[in-house]
Amino acid sequence: MNVRKDALKDLVTRFDNNITAYKDGKNAYNEHSCRIEYIDPFLQLLGWDVPNEAGLAPQYREVIAENYSNKTDRPDYSLTLRGVTKLFVEAKKPSVDIDTESAPAMQARKYGWNAKHKISILTNFEYFIIYDTTTVPKETDDCRVSRYRCYHYKDYIDKFDEIFHLVSKDSVYSGEFDKFFNDTFKGEGSQKQQVDNLFLNQINDWRVKLSNELYSKGNQYTSLEKLNDVVQEFINQIVFLRICEDRNLPLYHKLNETISDRDALHTKLEELFREADKRYNSGMFSGENIIFDLNNNVIVEMIEGLYYPQSPYMFNIIEPNMLGKIYELFLTEQLILLENGRMGLAKKKDCANRSVVTTPTEIVKYMVEKSLSNVCKGKSPAEICNLRIADIACGSGVYLEEAFQYLQAYCVEWYLTNEPDHLIEIGNGKYKLPLDEKKQILCSCIFGIDIDIHAVEVAKFSLLIKLIENETEPSVRDTTPILPELSSNILHGNALVGNQELAGKRYSTDTIISLVPYDWDEMPADGFDVILGNPPYVTTEDMHQLLSDAEFTIYKNKYKSSHKQFDKYFIFLERALQKVKNEGYVCYIVPNKFFKISAGAKLRGMLSNHLISLDDFGAAQLFEDKTIYSSIVLLQKRVQERFTYTNVDSANDLWLGKPTDSIELNNSSLNDLPWKLSPDFEFLATIKNIESVCVSLEKVAEIFNGIQTSAERPKPIYWFSGDEIINENDTTVTIQKGNKKYEIEKSILKPYFKPTKATEKGLTTYTKLSTDKRIIFPYDKSGHLISIERMQSDYPGAFAYLSDYYDRLVPKSVSSSGKRDVPNATADTWYQYGRTQALTAFINTPKLIVKVMAKDNPMYALDNEDMLIASGGTAGYCAVAKKNDSSYELEYIQAWLANSYTERIIQIVGSDFEGGFVSRGTFVLSSLPFVQLDFNDSKQKALYDRVVEASREVYSINDMLDQCPPKQIETTLVRQKDTLIKEIDGLVSRVYRLDF
C-alpha cells in the first residue's frame, strides 16, 4: 500500500504544480490529456488494469475505456468484474468545475442509474466524487444531490485507504463492494426507485391505460387475450424505436417528433411504424395496428415518458439483459377486468403463489461459458453456425441473449487470431462482427421454447435488441432488412408435452389449449448441442393447484423423475437430457435439495452417470428476497466416469474462477440414494473406504414415523398434559377439558412424548426421557382399531370424551361438516387416528426417539416406556428400534447414530434449513451407512461389547442422577457420564476408520 501511496504522491505533486494552467479555460489542456496523465494512473493505483496488461479478451477486460477522440454518449470508463460492469467513471478536464456545476453530476448519475449501479464516479482529478446512483436523477437536482463522497486531490493520500476500500479492484473482486453498498444504500421510496422498477411500473401503467382505452371501443377489444396481445405488441414497438434512437440507428424520424403536431400524430406515428417495418422487417411492426384506436393523450403520455425530463432513461446504457429481466417481471402479470368494469393487472395463475426470481448476471454468464466452451472449442466461425443452443423454458430470453453474446465473442476472438480484417473496429481495441454474420449466428444457433406466448414475444424482442448492440447507422446502411424474423427460433409451446403424448387420447379443445402441446418436429431433428437455463421450480402441491389433471397425469406417466412429491424442475432436467445430442450438454441452475430428498431418488439415479460437474451453493443465497438453496448442474448425455464437486460461497467467486473447495469423484459413487457430497476430501475417502463392509441402517434396524392424529389444532383432542390432570387412581385419570371433567381409563392411555415446555427442550442422546403427557390410544396389540361396542363397554369414559368432540374428529369422508383427512374412515371408525402406520411398533418395543430437525444437539434418546411420538414432518420425531433378527443391540445402534462421523454424513445428506438446521427423517436414517462387524473377530467383538457396556453404564448413571444426589456426588457422576460418552464416540469412530 505504501508503494501505491508514494506513486499517488508523485501524481498529486505534479498536478498541484500545474493546476493553475490546467484550470485556465483558454489552455489547450483537455480531458484526453487529463485521462492519460492522471485519471488512468489513479485508477491503476486502485488496482484497475486500465491498459489491459493481462491481455484479457475484450469481453473479460477489467476496464473498458471509451476512445478519447470518439466521444459518444457513453461513460469514459466501465469498471468490470470479469466483464460484468459494476460502476462507471466519468472524466472531465480540470477546467470543468465538477464541484459546483450540475450538468457533469447529472451525467454521471444518469449513467449509473440507467445501468442499475449503486454508485458512479465523477472526476477531473482535482476532485474525485462518488455519487449514489440508486436515486432517480431529476432535472432540478443540483450537484450536491446524492453526493456520497467528495475528495479533493490534496486529500487523496490521507484518504487513500478509504477510497481503496470503496472502489478498488480488490473491493469489487472480493465481493466487499457489493456487500458494503447494498448495506449502505438501503431504503425505499420514489426517490430510491432503480431503473428496472421505474421502467416496469411505467410500462405496466401503460398497459392499463392502453387497455382501458381500447376496451372502451368494444368489438375485438373485449377479448382479454386479444387485449394482452395487442397492448404488449404496441409497447414493444414504441420501446424498440426509442432504443434505436438512442443507439443512433436509422429511423424515418424520431419518436418524439411524431407528437409535435397533435393533429397529425396518428398519421405520423403510423408512417414511422410502416417505414420501420420496411427497414427492420422482423415482424415487430407487421401485426395489427392499434394507433388509430388510441386517443392522442395516451400516446403522447407514453412517448413523453421516454424522454428527459419526464424520465432519465438512456437506452444506450440500459443493457439488453436488464431489459430482459424487467420483462421477466412484466410477464408475471396479465390484464384482467375488475369488478368496477375497468381493466387492471393481476398475477398470472402460475405466478400467483410464488415469487419470480431473476438469475444474477454472473451466474448466467458462468453457466453459458461453462457449457458453451465445451462445444465451441477449436471451431471456426463457419462451424460455430452449425451449433444448436436452446433454453426450453426461455422466459424473457436472458440465457439465450448471453449465449448469443458468447458465440459472437468467440468468433471475434477467432477472427482476431486468424483473419482480423474481417472484423469491424468499434473503438479502443474493441471489435465486432458484421451485422449479417451476427444475424446468421442468431438464426442458426439460438432456439427457445416457452409455454407463455407473451414470453415468446419478449424473448424475440430481447434478442433483437441484443443483435443491434454496438450497431450504428453506418454499420447497418448496407443491410436490408436490418433484423431477422425469429418465428422459427423462438416458439410457443409446452416443452414437456409433445403431440406424441396426446396421440390416441381424446382431450377436449379447452384441455389441449391449456396443455399447449409442442411439436418437436419444428426444432432441429438431431437435437441440441446445449440446453441451458433456470427451469420453473413448482412443487407437486402447487402443480395440483395450477395444472389440469390431464397435464399432471401426462407428467406422471411420461417422466421417470416424477417420483413421489417431485418438483417440476425434475422433469425439465429429464426432458433436457432427452433432447440433447449424444455428445450434448445440459446446464441448469436448480435447488440442491434433489441431492438428498426421497422424491429425488429417480432423478438422482437418472443423472448420476451423466454428471460432469456440480457447483453447490449450500446455504448461500443467490436470489434477492427469495430463499433458495441452489446448485448448478452440468451434464453430458454421454456416460461419464468422473465429475467435479465444488462447494461455492458466492456467485462472484464462481464467475472469477477463484480457488474453491473442489474435488473430483467417481460417478460410480452416485446412485439413487442421497448423494454424499462434501468438499472434505479426507472425510469422503473415509466413507468410500467403508463402502464394501457397509449396509444401509434399515437392514439392521426398524425405522418408523410417529403417529398422526390429525386433531391437533386449535387444541389437541387425543392427548393431554399433566397440567390438565386433576385426579388419578389405579384405574382412571380425571382431566379437565374446557368446563367439563372426564374420567378416562388408564388402560387405553399411553405415555406421549411431545416436548412443549422450555424445561422439556434441549434434550440430547443420553438424556433420560420422561413425559407428563398421555394420549388415548384406541388400538389393540395388533394395531387394530378397538370397535365402538368395545369402546362403549370397556372404555366408556374415553369414548364419552371422544364423543363430546365428535364434530372435531369426524372425518370428511364420513360427514360433509368433517374437518379431518382420514383415509378409509367409516361411520363406525370416526375416532381413528389420521394416519395408522407403524402402530404396533409402539407396543412393547424399546426404541430410540429421534428429533427430526436438529442443529448442534441431535437426539437419539432411548425409550423403554412405550411412549408414543408425534410425526410432524421436520418439526416432529421419528423412531429407531432393533430388528427381531438383528445382531446389534439398540445401545450400539444408538452409539452409531450419535457418533460424530454419522453426524457429518447427516449434515451432507440431510435437507438443509435456515439457521443451520438439518433434517434427519426416516428417509435419511434408512440410507445411512452402517459398518457390519465381524463378531468372529475378537477385537471387533470386544469393541462392540464395550460400546454396549459403556452405554448401559451411562443409563445407570442417569438413574442415579434421577435421585437428586448431593452436589459433590452429582458433579462426579456427570463427569463420569461425559467420559463414557466420549469413550463411546471414540470407539465407534474407530469402526468408521476400520481401526480395530
What are these regions (language model features)?
Residues 272-274, 278-279, 283, 462, ...:
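Polynucleotide-recognition surfaces of large bacterial nucleic-acid defense/processing enzymes
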Residues 93, 100, 119, 570, ...:
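Polybasic, glycine- and aromatic-enriched phosphate-binding surface used to engage nucleic acids
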Residues 112-201, 646-680, 686:
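Mixed-charge intrinsically disordered linker/loop segments at interdomain junctions
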Residues 394, 532, 672, 676-678, ...:
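Non-catalytic DNA-recognition/assembly elements of restriction-modification systems
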Residues 2-25, 93, 163-408, 445-455, ...:
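Preference for the N-terminal adenyl/adenosyl cofactor-binding alpha/beta module
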Residues 1-119, 127-165, 175-182:
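A short, conserved, highly charged catalytic patch centered on acidic carboxylates
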